[in-house]
Curated annotation (Swiss-Prot):
Residues 1-370 are annotated as: Mediates interaction with EXOC2, EXOC4 and EXOC5. Belongs to the SEC6 family. As part of the exocyst, may play a role in regulated exocytosis of insulin granules. It comes from Mus musculus (Mouse). GO terms for cellular component: exocyst; secretory granule; transport vesicle. This is Exocyst complex component 3-like protein. GO terms for biological process: exocytosis; peptide hormone secretion. The gene is Exoc3l1. Ubiquitously expressed. The lineage of its organism: Eukaryota, Metazoa, Chordata, Craniata, Vertebrata. It is found in: Cytoplasmic vesicle, Secretory vesicle. Keywords: Cytoplasmic vesicle, Exocytosis. Signal peptide: none annotated.
Length: 739
């Protein structure tokens, strides 16, 4: 073999072309190195002597490499030879195994045919064993139908523990037959499932009547609970576990709800309060029964009091929600439900009773009424109360208005003031509806306050409209009121009484600005009544003032005496008006008289023909001012409220002897009465009868050029309410309104 693996190439011989690129590259590198070395030798002749040594060294190295290659190839060949030998041995072993398996296969086929012939015998053996077991259990199996019937009888007679023991024995006998029979159930055991269900229903029924049984037959309740607990912890072969504990708890809840909330709560209008009162008594009694009687019959894990409280709460909440989903409740029912749910139910009388203990706490559960429910109920309650209040106020107003056209004077109180129960009725209606909402919540209280303010404002507007209709019908003659003015004065007292008591409508802690609409409505009613009263006075005085000013007026006080007499007679009933209303009426009456006086002066009926007449006119103005002052002081008007002194200011204008000083006097008049106009001044100058065009122009110019009136005067308008006749062309000035 060594001769076969000897290399056929010698050093320096040409090599065949390599088959791999790596080999070719290595050969190129080797040739390059050899050429490099040879070129170095040739360039250095002294090295040529060593060429023989190099050749012998290279030959030795080649021989060494060839020897190493031979050794490696030899080891590879020996390994291959060993592997071939092992493969041969393995092939022989596989062939032997194959032959053994073939023989075993033939043997198994024979055994299968043999086992098939023995199968009937095996079945006979199994049947023999089953018959042997059934023979041993035959007496017990024969008693199964009778035991089933007896167990059913025990269930029907509510002997639950005995029935459960009998059922357990039957189920145990069934388990003993299942394994030997290979899981086959005998027909006689097919009724056990129905029997167990009947017992479960009996347990459930007993739990559902726990409250009654705890009082009448606690032994039955205890038996039912014990059966449920034992059965829950037992496992039955081939069946799902019977969770009778959950059935029992569910029955406890359903029975409790059935007692108190079986039918939907749809009480008749007004009957809701009775239903709530019945629950107020029944629910605490039910919790007391649960704590004293039911809880000792149940395991502690049942937490009977907590279960009772939560069940009653959920049932009650569901009933309340059903009630709210039905027809809209009336105001009384809405109030009863809100008060009961927010205060009574959670109060000490019911669920907040300290004797119930923490297990009965329902504060962490969903409330009976959500915030949305409360909002809707409060809004509905206020809307219904508002309708009712509006109706009652309308009835009160209609009753009052019906008396205005009567033959009798308005009634008076012991002090002699005109009096009517209407203001007290109005405020009582509003105050009672506000006060009752304090029992519910602050939000409802605020709603009621706002409703009351709104309704009082509407009532005052209706009251004002009724006064207008009353006055219109009287003045037109459609329905003449015998006591027109007294009833107007009585109405004045009504608004005064309402104004003095309207503060009861102001919520606690609220600013008085909340009542601003009501106060504005009261002011409007007051102004309207004053206007209606003074219109009558104005009509009565108008014929008297038609003769003023005149020569007769200059010479005698007879005209003003008639005015004072008529005014005094008209104001004689003012004392029946309560203060400060009487002062307001007297002040307005005096103002009306003064305005009528000024209107008469401005009509140009009189022109003084000399100094004597001007002096007489000035003196008459002084006397008239004093007479009017005396009249109204006698009637009770405070002096600070008088406006008759305007006549004294006009007197100074008439009493002035030097016409050149009229400008100063007119400027002073404007300082006192900023609303005086050129027409008014011209009418007064016409009354003097001695003012030339130049003096008139100077006086009117001073009216425009004078200093602005002092803002501290605080006087009400007088002259702006006094009309003046259209001046003639001869009296028009370029600076006047006719220019």
């Amino acid at each position: 073999m060594d001769s076969k693996i000897q290399p056929t190439l010698r050093p320096g011989s040409s090599c065949p072309r390599p088959e791999w690129p790596e080999q070719e590259r290595a050969e190129q590198l080797a040739r390059g190195a050899a050429l490099k070395w040879a070129s170095g030798i040739f360039y250095r002749p002294e090295q040529l002597t060593r060429l023989g040594q190099y050749r012998s060294r290279e030959i030795q190295r080649n021989y060494s490499l060839e020897a190493r290659i031979k050794s490696v190839v030899q080891s590879y060949l020996e390994g291959v030879q060993t592997g071939v030998w092992q493969l041969t041995r393995a092939l022989e072993a596989v062939q032997g195994t194959r032959e053994a398996l073939s023989q075993a296969h033939h043997l198994l086929k024979g055994l299968s045919r043999t086992s098939q012939t023995l199968e009937p015998l095996r079945e006979c053996v199994v049947q023999h064993k089953q018959l042997q077991i059934l023979t041993r259990l035959l007496p017990r199996l024969q008693a199964v139908p009778a035991t089933v019937a007896h167990t059913q009888t025990l269930i029907d007679s509510e002997r639950l523990l005995e029935a459960y023991v009998s059922l357990r024995e039957l189920e145990q006998l069934k388990e003993e037959t299942l394994a030997p029979l290979g899981g086959l159930e005998l027909p006689i055991f097919q009724g056990l499932g129905l029997l167990a269900e009947a017992l479960g229903q009996a347990v459930e029924a007993a739990a559902g009547a726990a409250g009654r049984l705890a009082r009448e037959d606690p032994a039955l309740l205890v038996a039912a609970i014990r059966v449920a607990e034992v059965e829950t912890e037992r496992t039955i072969l081939g069946q799902a576990p019977r969770d009778w504990r959950q059935r029992c708890l569910r029955a406890l809840q359903e029975g409790l709800e059935r007692v108190h909330f079986a039918s939907p709560v749809l009480p008749e209008p007004g009957a809701l309060a009775g239903w709530l009162e019945a629950l107020q008594v029944a629910l605490p009694a039910e919790l007391a029964t649960a704590e004293a009687l039911v809880a000792p019959c149940c395991p502690p894990s049942y937490r009977v009091v907590e279960l009772w409280a939560h069940t009653l709460h959920s049932g009650l909440r569901r009933s309340v929600q059903q009630l709210l989903a039905g027809p809209e409740l009336g105001a009384a029912d809405t109030f009863a439900l809100l008060h009961w749910a927010l205060h009574v139910y959670t109060g000490k009388e019911m669920m907040g009773n300290l004797e119930l203990g923490p297990e009965a706490d329902v504060s962490q559960l969903e409330p009976l009424l959500t915030s949305e429910n409360i909002e809707q109920l409060e809004a509905a309650f206020v809307a219904q109360v508002q309708v009712s209040v509006a109706q009652w106020l309308k009835k009160a107003l209609d009753g009052e208005v019906a008396e205005w056209s009567g033959e009798q004077e308005p009634p008076t109180d012991p002090s002699g003031f005109y009096h009517s129960p209407m203001p007290a009725i109005v405020l009582q209606i509003l105050a009672e509806n506000i006060q009752v909402t304090n029992l519910i919540s602050d939000s409802l209280h605020r709603r009621a306050h706002n409703m009351a303010v709104s309704e009082l404002g509407a009532f005052l507007r209706s009251f004002s409209d009724a006064l207008i209709r009353f006055s219109r019908d009287h003045l037109r003659g459609d329905a003449v009121a015998p006591h027109y003015v007294p009833y107007l004065l009585s109405a004045f007292n009504h608004q005064s009484a309402l104004r003095s008591s309207v503060s009861v409508l102001l919520p606690d802690g609220e600013a008085s600005g909340v009542l601003a609409p009501v106060e504005a409505a009261l002011d409007d009613v007051q102004r309207r009544i004053c206007r209606l009263v003074l219109e009558v006075l104005q009509v009565e005085l108008q014929p008297l003032f038609s003769a003023l000013p005149s020569r007769r007026w200059l010479l005698s006080s007879e005209l003003l005496d008639g005015v004072c007499e008529q005014t005094s007679h008209f104001c004689q009933d003012f004392w029946r008006v309560r203060k400060p209303g009487v002062q307001l009426l007297l002040a307005e009456a005096e103002r009306t008289v003064v305005l009528q006086y000024l209107r008469a002066l401005m009509q140009g009926r009189l022109v003084c023909r000399g100094t004597d007449e001007r002096s007489q006119a000035a003196e008459r103005l002084r006397q008239d001012a004093a007479q009017l002052k005396e009249l109204f002081l006698g009637l009770g008007l405070e002096e600070s409220a008088h406006c008759a002194p305007v006549l004294l200011a006009l007197r100074e204008l008439l009493n002035l002897h030097d016409p050149t000083l009229l400008g100063l006097e007119v400027a002073g008049l404007r300082q006192q009465f900023p609303d005086v106009s050129e027409d008014h001044v011209s009418a007064l100058l016409d009354l003097r009868g001695d003012v030339s065009r130049e003096h008139r122009q100077a006086a009117l110019s001073s009216l425009q050029a004078g200093p602005p009136p002092s803002p501290s005067t605080g006087r009400r308008a007088l002259f702006s309410l006094v009309p003046t006749p259209t001046p003639s062309l001869s009296s028009c000035l370029p600076s006047g309104p006719c220019s």
